Amino acid sequence: MLLRTKALIRSGGSIAKYAAANPSCFILQRRGLRREFGPKYTAKINEAEENWQARAEAIKKGKKQNTWDLFEERGYVKDTAGTKEHIAELMRTRRIGAYVGIDPTAPSLHVGHLLPLMPLFWMYLEGYKAFTLIGGSTAKIGDPTGRLKSRDHLSSSDATMNMTKIHYQLKKLWENVDTQMRARGYEADWARKRGIVNNNHWWNKQPMLEVLRRVGHALRIGPMLSRDTVKNKMTQGDGVSFAEFTYPIMQGWDWFELFYQQGVQMQIGGSDQYGNIISGLEVVKAARESEPDPQERKYVTPKTALDECVGFTVPLLTDSSGAKFGKSAGNAIWLDPYQTSVFDFYGYFVRRSDQEVENLLKLFTFMPISEITKTMEEHIKDPSKRVAQHTLAREVVTLVHGKQEASAAEDQHRMMYTGQMTIPQVSRAKDAATGGDQYKTISDQPVTLNNAPRIDMILPESLIMGKSIGRILYAAGLASSTTEGHKLAAAQGCYVGGAHRAGGENVTMNPDLISFMPVKLWFPGETQRYLINGNLLILRKGKHNVRVIQMVSDVEYAASGQTYPGQSFTGAVRKLNEIMKNLKEKKLTPEEAKNAVNELQKSSQEKQQGQQIIFPEEKSRQKKDMETKLKQEMIASVKTIDGMMDEKPSVRGDGVKKQTQDDRDPYKW
């Protein structure tokens, strides 16, 4: 969400003087919104500034490392917008803000996104302000950089799906960075800030005419046409559209909005983003000079070189074979555990060569250089143990998926390659999860970003449009039954995503502004009002248990082979009757029918495992009797094939099978 920051300072004292000298460090809110800080807050700001100046003095005397020097030491810097000396001095003296922008053109981040994010995470650890920008609006245009063919147009529902999933991936990364910060012993710093911002927040309100009026005159087509990426697309590709020409302007305006609202003076980009960063600097400069409000112009207009914006790009990484880093057999290594399993993700880093592993430890971990040196010394003693590779894999998986998943994945790999027979499963067994198992939570643990179930799913139109919200919550795995789903909705214990537009009955949710409001009991026909783009429903239970549900036709859902909890005609009794029918019609042999029954029983027993039954402690004898009976029922075999053939189901006069006591018993077929 867009973080609201503090307004201009009109009060007296040292803060006002510092604000006048350093306008970018005290952030403007929307025009005309100014307020004074109270004495306690003023004292906190003064203390934070004094601490930062003490830090700057320690860096000057060589007692502490400059963060820019850390970047160069670890290999994060490729091209710079601004001299290295200027950037180093800026980072020494100012608690600047920095950002990395990501367009949600795919449903997940991949390993390649981690490289520009790592210096941003380091800045956060060192006490700066760090922001990740989701390009909800710029993704609709598509960055032409490095492409010969224009990106395929994203539908509104796909864009919303991608935007939501990437938002939660970034939240997960930031929480894991916080965990690493505490584990590495970084001191608490009140002025340290981080945030996730979506450029939909201003592009949905900002007229393009106003943007062009303020910055259009400062940009020239010639320099844009002279870039290699544009030349290649025009001569070897499908040409550059007018929309793609506007992309650098939109990206530059994003930077200005972040500067205006959060004091962001630095942009960090991938190896191919240098041209966009240079264009962004021109847009920010033009926007600052064309500020229409005279009162605010004196604050946004740069007074010294340290008020100017800067940027840099990270290098392009390739592995020992020359392939682009983050690819395996031509496929991206995704951060989504359901697209690249935790086991495979860990394995990708374990397979790195000895020649590249030290560099990767510097780039993708928060390990101090001294610790990396010791790891490499231990690795050299016996390279076959792959000590450095396992350290790299463990650190990266901890950052992306959490410590518990990293430990489990490490155990899996070590036991697999040491010949042990028993291989432990990762905590949520994401690697083996299929169908409805991907949406289950751990019964005895709270849902966190690291153990949350899969977000995206499909459900049939007949359910979404024709059933109650309680049934939908049950089908989505957010409730254990339809009854619980109704109770959740009645108590407003779950939420629907989107910004509802006031108006007619059929006016649907706004796909560009994803916020959440409590779910209420509504008629099945009203669900349509909460769909985004007519086919996307976003639900949330708790803080992190989210479902982005794509509504598909019943035919398409049936073709997918999936089922959902509470789906009609999928019960065990009905499946058994179907086996009996196929047997009598000789579509199955007795042996095939027996195997089908055994599979059905096995599936039922697997579903029942892990569902803990709690017995009253005061009735110890009753508890023992019930536990014994339950165990007997769960391991009892079904009737023999001959018995099934001889038995005739009870049938009413209308030909419909009556429900017998065995049908009602959940532990019998």
UniProtKB/Swiss-Prot annotation:
It comes from Neurospora crassa (strain ATCC 24698 / 74-OR23-1A / CBS 708.71 / DSM 1257 / FGSC 987). This is Tyrosine--tRNA ligase, mitochondrial. The lineage of its organism: Eukaryota, Fungi, Dikarya, Ascomycota, Pezizomycotina. One of its GO terms (cellular component) is mitochondrion. Transmembrane segments: none annotated. A motif ('KMSKS' region) lies at residues 324-328. It comes from the Eukaryota. SUPFAM superfamilies: Nucleotidylyl transferase. One of its GO terms (molecular function) is identical protein binding. PROSITE patterns: AA_TRNA_LIGASE_I (PS00178). GO terms for biological process: Group I intron splicing; mRNA processing; positive regulation of RNA splicing; RNA folding; tRNA aminoacylation; tyrosyl-tRNA aminoacylation. Catalyzes the attachment of tyrosine to tRNA(Tyr) in a two-step reaction: tyrosine is first activated by ATP to form Tyr-AMP and then transferred to the acceptor end of tRNA(Tyr). Has both an aminoacyl-tRNA synthetase activity and is involved in the splicing of group I introns. It acts in intron splicing by stabilizing the catalytically active structure of the intron. It is found in: Mitochondrion matrix. Keywords: Aminoacyl-tRNA synthetase, ATP-binding, Ligase, Mitochondrion, mRNA processing, Nucleotide-binding, Protein biosynthesis, Transit peptide. InterPro entries: aa-tRNA-synth_I_CS, aa-tRNA-synth_Ic, Rossmann-like_a/b/a_fold, S4_RNA-bd_sf, Tyr-tRNA-ligase, Tyr-tRNA-ligase_bac-type, TyrRSs_C. PANTHER family: TYROSINE--TRNA LIGASE, MITOCHONDRIAL (PTHR11766:SF0), TYROSYL-TRNA SYNTHETASE (PTHR11766). Belongs to the class-I aminoacyl-tRNA synthetase family.
